[in-house]
């Protein structure tokens, strides 16, 4: 009952924060509000703050709900779990391999090898993508998907979380200045990727021990930082289906092998 209560509280609070803030930003669009992917002025930085609150809604809800239900004593305890980096080398290699596999398949299928941005921009954008992107997993993978997995198993919990995550992303396609809102990202391709990636996050969580939440945060951060570098390379249906099918397959095989190893 406690897990179910926490899931419901977390999901409701996440969507309340997300849709309240994003709704306000959409309403302010005609009056000049816009998100800025690259910040050059203090004004642009300030305009990104409310957008960051929307994106951080799963993390905000995670702490509030866990604190309310006495699952964490204070913010520092919550933060230590989210940023527990003392892991074995294998989960780090798995995260990097997942990124390499995804983008390599897209490049192979699309036949495009040019980069839209220099590779060093990945490093420059990591801090921003930690806040606007990576820390979502402090909610999705600290509370929602793991607790759903306890009752429903790996596959169904990945699907259920993917559906919720897709719905949570919908306002992005209406907020001025986002790649989604500017038409640079196809909603249905994005939905396929979102659903597939929940399987990969589930696999990361399964193999990563005490640092499981951080490893999911790391993958999300690195993926968001890497995506702009490849530009439209990832925007083909052939690549979308092939790359995401591969991610799902790798995830399922990884979890099955892990479970068999730890049962024996």
Model feature map: region roles:
Residues 155-182:
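Membrane-helix boundary elements
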Residues 20, 134-139, 143-144, 148, ...:
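Active-site His/Glu-centered metal-binding helix of metallohydrolases
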């Amino acid at each position: 009952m406690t897990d179910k209560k926490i899931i419901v509280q977390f999901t409701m609070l996440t969507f309340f924060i997300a849709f309240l803030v994003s709704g306000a930003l959409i309403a302010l669009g005609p009056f000049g509000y816009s998100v800025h992917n690259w910040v050059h002025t203090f004004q642009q930085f300030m305009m990104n703050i409310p957008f960051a609150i929307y994106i951080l809604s799963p993390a905000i809800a995670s702490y509030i709900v866990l604190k309310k239900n006495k699952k964490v004593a204070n913010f520092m305890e919550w933060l230590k779990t989210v940023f527990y980096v003392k892991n074995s080398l294998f989960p780090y290699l798995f995260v990097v391999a997942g990124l390499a596999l995804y983008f390599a398949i897209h490049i192979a299928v699309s036949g495009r090898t040019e980069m839209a941005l220099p590779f060093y921009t990945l490093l420059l954008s990591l801090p921003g993508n930690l806040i606007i992107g990576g820390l979502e997993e402090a909610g999705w993978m600290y509370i929602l998907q793991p607790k759903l997995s306890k009752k429903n198993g790996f596959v169904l919990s990945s699907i259920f979380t993917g559906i919720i995550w897709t719905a949570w992303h919908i306002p992005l396609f209406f907020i001025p200045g986002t790649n989604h809102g500017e038409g640079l990202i196809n909603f249905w391709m994005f939905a396929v990727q979102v659903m597939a990636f929940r399987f990969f996050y589930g696999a990361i969580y399964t193999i990563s021990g005490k640092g499981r939440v951080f490893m999911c945060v790391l993958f999300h951060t690195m993926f968001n930082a890497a995506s702009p570098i490849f530009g439209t390379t990832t925007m083909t249906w052939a690549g979308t289906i092939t790359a995401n099918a591969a991610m799902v397959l790798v995830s399922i095989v990884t979890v099955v092998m892990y479970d068999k190893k730890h049962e024996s």
